[in-house]
Amino acid sequence: MENKYKLWVARDKNGFLFAYEDKPKRCDNKKEWFAEKFLFSIENSFFPNLKWEDEPLEVMLTQVIKS
């Protein structure tokens, strides 16, 4: 059985990586991304090619339940 969840990943100006439920919008003044729902922070070494200057990345998180 698999469950899939769509989320958005974005890196802030300081290099920190975050996941959002909706596509976030860039806030240049604060050098961060903002969305209705912030989900969680992500290990900074993940998505090494994703930079502050890039648009958020849409990803699918798949939960795999082993029997």
Which residue stretches match the model-derived regions?
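A short beta-strand micro-motif
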Residues: 6-12
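Low-complexity intrinsically disordered segments
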Residues: 28-67
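Short, surface-exposed terminal/edge motifs of secreted or surface/virion proteins that either
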Residues: 16-28
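N-terminal helix-cap/turn-to-beta initiation motif at the start of protein domains
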Residues: 1-5
